[in-house]
Design a protein with these regions (language model features):
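Terminal low-complexity "docking" segments
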Residues: 1-121
Protein backbone atom coordinates (compact mmCIF):
# COMPACT_ATOMS: atom_id res chain seq x y z
CA UNK A 1 0.00 0.00 0.00
CA UNK A 2 1.50 3.34 -1.00
CA UNK A 3 1.77 6.35 1.30
CA UNK A 4 -0.92 9.02 1.16
CA UNK A 5 0.10 12.60 0.29
CA UNK A 6 -0.34 13.49 3.96
CA UNK A 7 2.11 10.79 5.02
CA UNK A 8 4.66 11.92 2.46
CA UNK A 9 4.48 15.54 3.65
CA UNK A 10 4.42 14.71 7.34
CA UNK A 11 6.82 11.77 7.32
CA UNK A 12 9.31 13.68 9.47
CA UNK A 13 7.07 16.41 10.90
CA UNK A 14 4.51 14.33 12.77
CA UNK A 15 5.19 12.40 15.96
CA UNK A 16 4.17 8.74 15.60
CA UNK A 17 0.60 8.34 16.79
CA UNK A 18 0.17 12.03 17.68
CA UNK A 19 -3.33 13.33 16.96
CA UNK A 20 -3.66 15.93 14.21
CA UNK A 21 -6.43 18.46 13.76
CA UNK A 22 -7.26 20.89 10.98
CA UNK A 23 -8.39 24.36 11.94
CA UNK A 24 -10.35 25.36 8.84
CA UNK A 25 -11.57 28.76 7.70
CA UNK A 26 -14.99 27.69 6.42
CA UNK A 27 -15.58 31.20 5.09
CA UNK A 28 -12.78 30.39 2.65
CA UNK A 29 -13.72 26.74 1.96
CA UNK A 30 -17.37 26.09 2.74
CA UNK A 31 -17.31 22.40 1.81
CA UNK A 32 -14.86 21.43 4.59
CA UNK A 33 -17.48 20.37 7.19
CA UNK A 34 -19.32 18.34 4.55
CA UNK A 35 -16.05 16.72 3.44
CA UNK A 36 -15.28 15.83 7.07
CA UNK A 37 -18.70 14.28 7.62
CA UNK A 38 -18.43 12.33 4.36
CA UNK A 39 -15.06 10.97 5.52
CA UNK A 40 -16.49 10.05 8.92
CA UNK A 41 -14.22 12.33 10.95
CA UNK A 42 -15.34 14.57 13.81
CA UNK A 43 -15.91 18.23 13.01
CA UNK A 44 -16.89 21.05 15.39
CA UNK A 45 -17.57 24.74 14.82
CA UNK A 46 -15.74 27.16 17.09
CA UNK A 47 -19.00 29.07 17.51
CA UNK A 48 -21.79 27.72 19.69
CA UNK A 49 -25.44 28.44 20.41
CA UNK A 50 -27.28 31.16 18.52
CA UNK A 51 -24.06 32.58 17.08
CA UNK A 52 -23.07 29.10 15.92
CA UNK A 53 -26.34 28.66 14.08
CA UNK A 54 -26.17 32.15 12.56
CA UNK A 55 -22.57 31.70 11.34
CA UNK A 56 -22.56 27.94 10.61
CA UNK A 57 -21.70 28.45 6.93
CA UNK A 58 -18.68 30.68 7.62
CA UNK A 59 -17.52 29.77 11.13
CA UNK A 60 -14.08 28.25 11.67
CA UNK A 61 -14.14 24.52 12.42
CA UNK A 62 -11.81 22.11 14.16
CA UNK A 63 -11.69 18.81 12.30
CA UNK A 64 -9.95 15.55 13.21
CA UNK A 65 -7.20 14.85 10.69
CA UNK A 66 -6.36 11.15 10.38
CA UNK A 67 -3.46 10.79 7.94
CA UNK A 68 -5.09 7.97 6.03
CA UNK A 69 -8.56 9.30 5.36
CA UNK A 70 -10.69 10.70 2.59
CA UNK A 71 -10.57 14.01 4.44
CA UNK A 72 -6.76 14.22 4.37
CA UNK A 73 -6.78 13.33 0.68
CA UNK A 74 -9.32 16.12 0.06
CA UNK A 75 -7.27 18.54 2.24
CA UNK A 76 -4.15 18.03 0.17
CA UNK A 77 -6.11 18.64 -3.03
CA UNK A 78 -6.81 22.11 -1.56
CA UNK A 79 -3.12 22.70 -0.80
CA UNK A 80 -2.13 26.28 -1.64
CA UNK A 81 -5.65 27.67 -1.17
CA UNK A 82 -5.01 28.87 2.41
CA UNK A 83 -8.03 27.11 3.87
CA UNK A 84 -6.55 26.47 7.30
CA UNK A 85 -3.75 25.14 9.42
CA UNK A 86 -2.84 21.76 10.88
CA UNK A 87 -2.21 21.27 14.58
CA UNK A 88 -0.43 18.38 16.27
CA UNK A 89 -1.38 17.98 19.93
CA UNK A 90 -2.10 15.24 22.43
CA UNK A 91 -5.29 17.13 23.39
CA UNK A 92 -8.78 15.91 22.50
CA UNK A 93 -10.99 17.56 19.89
CA UNK A 94 -13.09 19.07 22.70
CA UNK A 95 -10.00 20.50 24.39
CA UNK A 96 -8.64 21.92 21.12
CA UNK A 97 -12.00 23.52 20.39
CA UNK A 98 -12.25 24.93 23.92
CA UNK A 99 -8.75 26.42 23.66
CA UNK A 100 -9.31 28.06 20.28
CA UNK A 101 -12.66 29.48 21.41
CA UNK A 102 -10.74 31.53 23.99
CA UNK A 103 -8.89 33.27 21.13
CA UNK A 104 -11.97 34.27 19.12
CA UNK A 105 -12.29 37.81 20.47
CA UNK A 106 -9.97 40.65 21.40
CA UNK A 107 -10.55 44.01 23.04
CA UNK A 108 -9.15 47.36 22.02
CA UNK A 109 -7.79 49.98 24.40
CA UNK A 110 -11.33 51.19 25.04
CA UNK A 111 -12.50 47.66 25.89
CA UNK A 112 -14.59 47.23 22.74
CA UNK A 113 -14.84 43.61 21.70
CA UNK A 114 -13.91 42.43 18.18
CA UNK A 115 -13.76 39.06 16.47
CA UNK A 116 -10.20 37.98 15.81
CA UNK A 117 -9.63 35.75 12.78
CA UNK A 118 -6.49 34.14 14.21
CA UNK A 119 -7.20 31.02 12.15
CA UNK A 120 -6.93 32.88 8.82
CA UNK A 121 -3.72 31.57 7.26
Amino acid sequence: MSASPAEVVFDRAVSPGAPLFALVDVARESSAPHQARQAGVACESLFAGEMGELLKDVAPHVIEFPLRSRFSEWWFQQWGNSIGVLIETPASLADVRRHFRTLMTVRDDQHRKYFFRFYDP
